[in-house]
From Swiss-Prot:
Keywords: ATP-binding, Kinase, Magnesium, Manganese, Multifunctional enzyme, Nucleotide-binding, Nucleotidyltransferase, Transferase. Residues 559-949 are annotated as: L-fucokinase. This is L-fucokinase/L-fucose-1-P guanylyltransferase. It comes from Bacteroides fragilis. It holds the Pfam family GHMP_kinases_C. The lineage of its organism: Bacteria, Pseudomonadati, Bacteroidota, Bacteroidia, Bacteroidales. Changing K89A: Almost complete loss of fucose-1-phosphate guanylyltransferase activity. Changing G717A: Loss of fucokinase activity. The keyword Nucleotide-binding applies. GO terms for molecular function: ATP binding; fucokinase activity; nucleotidyltransferase activity. Bifunctional enzyme involved in the salvage pathway of GDP-fucose synthesis. Catalyzes two successive reactions, the ATP-dependent phosphorylation of L-fucose to L-fucose 1-phosphate, and its guanylylation to GDP-L-fucose. GDP-fucose is an important fucose donor in the process of fucosylated oligosaccharides formation. Changing G597A: Almost complete loss of fucokinase activity.
Length: 949
């Protein structure tokens, strides 16, 4: 998916180097010099320039349909946000959200905008190849996006207060046909909107437009002068947009014929970053979106919430009076005096005595190899107007007054005087000392002769010239140097900073690239989750450095295990023989299929975010496939047998019992289960000298026999549910009185003991019967709330035969997959956290579809689950599995490999019973290997059962 950016001309050449992105995926240009094209003409220019570079001999139409593209308009003079005019508003650094995990310390408006646009384009129908958006907004969507209809033009809008809509475009739809655009308005008055509301609904245009290839070609045609290749001014919104709809405001035969769909952005939020004031107000709004202290990791309380400092060194204390403050890429020395309503950008390291009046901003721009341009301005300055007009202000006062206070006349100025943006008034100096003196004179000390003399002898630049000539590499280098110091400070002050909620994978790359020492080990009294993050960050830094990282990584997993074990460390067990000498306890369980939300149950993600999973318990070929038999034996030892593996082991000592970490051992699970039941010293309420002594006190030895009538690596939660079945049978045998919830919680701990990791959904999925939505809150005590769902879609004759389960004969062990994904969870990887958040929301959609009894929607959502699993782990769908799917996918509504994927079983939702017959025939005749076969699945209405002989 290619990104096309329209940028300030000075940024175009250095963008790829500064942002460290490749040129193939990112195309940049600027509007032609001296031409105003509007957003429509600018879109045409951007597409034409990209086509000229990448067409490779194809026609424009062929090139257009070749791939999807995101166009971002981020050029312009940025008169109302001068502090970020040289580097473009789209690259404005944005502070990490105090309530969000997985963000980057170096994030900017572009990196925050892009994920939503990419998500929209991934959902767009095949004929929609072009998305157009603005570069000075940040748009969030808190809910899953709806499906995107087939149309020539698709626009997103927001339900907003009418007063806000008066500043933007508005989509009006007849109340009788809300899905159709009736017409569009540009910046309507409140009176117009009030009149309109009687018959119409209106959405505010948020500037996200998707165009079909036909719509693009018409837009480009309208952007050119008639019978000419020369572009003219044509606005996407006020020209093209007003010609759209059933009753368009502009008559245009071709544009009028385009079909239009208007979509409300689900859970949409709109933050504008177009002006200096909005820079602060929008950042404040997004930071204050969440007040729930449980979601805010750090313990820092700012003197004033409207106070943002990043990539900076501040040597003065900040207080509540310093409201509406933005300091970025700057050094504020100990002799500075600041007030409120400031934006301070680009200030190099200094030792100035500088007083900044309230409402005044300071911008320093590197020019050439050594020069600095001093640009003070007012927070409300708009950088337009004739210099003699009293409404034209600099530093918040009329420009003429600013001049007269400093004993300057208009003859001291060079260049135009009809537009403040074009007047050369800002001096360039070559030393930090001179920079401080001239700023004092320009800001608050107009009588400072030394400062005036520097101004008079300096070369001067206009705002336009500053943007055109700024040395952006120096600007970025200074920012990076400040950020190096910030990384160190954030790590040291982790309790009061956002450090351990950042994307630590990104942090590790920065630490290595910048040559920073890795953070020190956290003390034992630090928060457990912070210690886990700390260890995994250290491991990632060592790995990137090519050093041995495994001890640090293992320490992170050990801390996670310890945190989960803490939950039962004070609930030690005293097992008592609770059967007759000739009795056998028989436990059996179904397996589970995860329909949506799998992975969100896995620690540590579930511990800091909670999880949502929809799954169902199933029996195979008419029986629960996991069975455990426990009976007393005369000798005081433990006998372990596996029917399916044909193995046996006798355990006589505590050491032998606690040797359960060996992956692949047939008896790891029963050893760990018996340990948890109180037969190991760590979990026993009574101390014994030996296992034999304990068993004598118990009254018998123990014989445990396992039967797993299902292949390993099946993806049906076999190991977890087998563990629960063993725990459940031992619980009954030993009179421990655990309920099903306790059994499942101890299974989670058992898996940590085995070092295989894993979440809670497998055991709850099998132990609890039927179809259910399982949900947990954040915290180490993961005890899901269970909501049982109707089983109509799985048991009704119309649908029962449409659920197919096919054993592929391909196996894959989940441990390696788990370790990789869990490591990413430890590191707050933004890619993984975003996917997991989508999965969590997706589980609620699945829950809704099952409750509504919508079979088609259910099948579609199963398919979406599969797409999410593939995005999370590329190894989920190996070629051998894809080959099987290719044979039958046209007959399904959805399909997935349960569990971690990569092999095991393939679950399919056939479109109808006839399609199910066809699928059975195809796969029976084209079996990929001798082990592949269909297995009959039925919904389990009992879950885990235990009985006695």
């Amino acid at each position: 998916m290619q990104k096309l950016l329209s940028l300030p001309s000075n940024l175009v050449q250095s963008f790829h180097e500064l942002e460290r992105v490749n040129r193939t995926d990112w195309f940049c240009t600027s509007d032609p010099v001296g031409k105003k094209l509007g957003s429509g003409g600018g879109t045409s220019w951007l597409l034409e320039e990209c086509y000229n570079e990448y067409s490779d001999g194809a026609t424009f139409g062929e090139w257009l349909e070749k791939e999807k593209r995101i166009l971002l308009h981020a050029g312009g003079q940025s008169r109302r946000l001068p502090g970020y005019a040289p580097s473009g508003k789209i690259l404005t650094p944005v502070p990490v959200f105090r309530w969000e995990r997985g963000q980057h310390l170096g994030q900017n408006l572009l990196s925050l905008q892009l994920p939503l646009y990419e998500k929209i384009m991934s959902l767009a129908p095949d004929k929609l190849h072009t998305l157009i958006a603005s570069g000075d907004v940040y748009i969030r969507s808190e809910k899953p996006l709806q499906s995107i209809p087939e149309a020539d033009v698709v626009c997103y809008g927001l339900w907003v207060d009418p007063s806000l809509a008066t500043h933007h475009g508005v989509f009006a739809s007849d109340r009788k046909h809300p899905e159709q655009l009736d017409f569009m308005l540009q910046k309507p008055s409140l009176a117009e909107l009030e009149s309109l509301s009687k018959t119409h609904l209106f959405l505010m245009d948020i500037g996200i437009w998707l165009l079909s290839d036909r719509a693009v070609e018409i837009l480009m045609k309208r952007s050119h002068k008639e019978s000419s290749e020369e572009l003219k001014y044509y606005d996407l919104y006020s020209d093209f947009g007003l010609a759209l709809g059933t009753h368009p405001r502009i008559e245009d035969e071709e544009v009028n014929t385009l079909s239009v769909a208007i979509l409300p952005l689900p859970g949409g939020e709109f933050y504008h970053y177009g002006t200096s004031k909005e820079l602060i107000s929008s950042t404040l709004s997004v930071q204050n979106k969440v007040y729930d202290q449980r979601r805010i990791m750090h313990r820092k309380v700012k003197p004033n919430p409207a106070m943002f400092v990043q990539n900076a060194v501040v040597r003065i204390p900040l207080c509540a009076e310093n409201a509406d403050l933005w300091i970025e890429n700057s050094h504020i020395g100990p002799k500075w005096k600041i007030a409120s309503r400031h934006i301070i950008t680009g200030v190099p390291e200094n030792d100035w005595s500088l007083a900044v009046p309230a409402g005044v901003c300071v911008d320093v721009v590197p020019m050439g190899d050594k020069g600095f341009v001093a640009r003070p301005y007012g927070l409300d300055d708009v950088f337009k107007g004739d210099l003699r007009d009293s409404k034209t202000t600099l530093t918040g006062i009329p420009f003429g007054e600013w001049m007269s206070k400093r004993g300057l006349s208009y003859t001291d100025l060079k260049g135009r005087t009809d537009d403040l943006q074009a007047v050369s008034v800002f001096p360039m100096v070559n030393s930090v000392e001179e920079l401080g003196l001239v700023l004092r004179w320009m800001l608050s000390e107009p009588e400072l002769e030394e400062g005036k003399n520097i101004w008079l002898r300096s070369e001067h630049f206009s705002a336009d010239e500053i943007s055109a000539g700024a040395n952006l590499k120096r600007l970025y280098a200074q920012r990076e140097e400040f950020r190096k110091g910030n990384w160190k400070a954030l790590a040291v002050n982790h309790e009061k900073s956002v450090f351990y909620q950042l994307d630590l994978a990104d942090a590790a790359e920065d630490f290595v690239r910048l040559g920073l020492d890795m953070p020190e080990l956290l003390p034992e009294d630090a928060l457990q989750m912070s210690r886990i993050h700390n260890r995994m960050l250290r491991a990632r830094i060592l790995k990137l450095d090519g050093k041995d990282y495994r001890p640090e990584e293992q320490a992170a997993f050990d801390l996670l295990r310890d945190g989960l074990l803490d939950g039962i460390s004070n609930r030690k067990s005293t097992p008592k023989l609770d059967v007759y000498s000739d009795q056998i306890v028989w436990g059996r369980s179904p397996v589970r299929i995860d329909m949506a939300g799998g992975w969100t149950d896995t620690p540590p993600y579930s511990l800091y975010s909670g999880g949502n999973v929809v799954n169902l318990a199933i029996e195979l070929n008419g029986q629960p496939p996991l069975q455990v038999y426990v009976k007393p034996c005369k000798d005081f030892h433990i006998v372990l047998r596996s029917i399916d593996m044909g193995a046996m082991e006798i355990v006589s000592t505590f050491d032998e019992l606690q040797d359960y970490k060996k992956i692949g051992s047939p008896f790891s699970i029963p050893k760990a289960a018996l340990s948890l039941a109180g037969f190991a010293p760590a979990f026993s309420a009574v101390s014994y000298a030996s296992l034999e002594e304990q068993l004598k006190d118990f009254g018998a030895g123990i014989e445990v026999t396992l039967l797993a009538a299902i292949p390993a690596g099946s993806g049906l939660g076999t190991s977890s549910i087998l563990a629960s079945t063993v725990l459940g049978a031992i619980n009954d045998f030993c009179g421990l009185a655990w309920d099903k919830n306790e059994i499942c919680q101890r299974t989670l701990v058992l898996e940590q003991l085995l070092t295989t990791g894993g979440g809670w959904q497998d055991q709850y999925g099998g132990v609890l019967q039927g179809v259910k939505l399982l949900q947990t809150e954040a915290g180490f005590a993961q005890s899901p709330l269970v909501r049982w769902l109707p089983d109509h879609l799985f048991t009704h004759p119309e649908y029962k035969d449409c659920h197919l389960l096919y054993y592929t004969g391909i196996t894959r062990t989940a441990k390696g997959i788990l370790a990789e994904i869990v490591s990413s969870m430890f590191l707050n990887s933004s890619l993984h956290l975003n996917l997991l958040s989508e999965m969590k929301a997706h589980a609620l959609d699945m829950n809704e579809a099952i409750q509504r009894g919508s079979f088609v929607e259910f099948g579609r959502l199963v398919g979406k689950t599969w797409e999410q699993n593939k995005a999370l782990d590329s190894g989920t769908n190996p070629p051998a599995v894809e080959a099987i799917i290719d044979l039958i996918k046209d007959y399904t509504l959805g399909y997935k490999l349960p569990g971690a994927g990569g092999g095991g079983y393939l679950y399919m939702v056939a479109k109808d019973p006839q399609a199910a017959v066809r699928i059975r025939k195809i796969l029976t005749e084209n079996a990929p290997n001798p082990r592949a076969r269909f297995v009959e699945m039925t919904l389990s209405d009992k879950g885990f059962q235990v009985s006695r002989s």
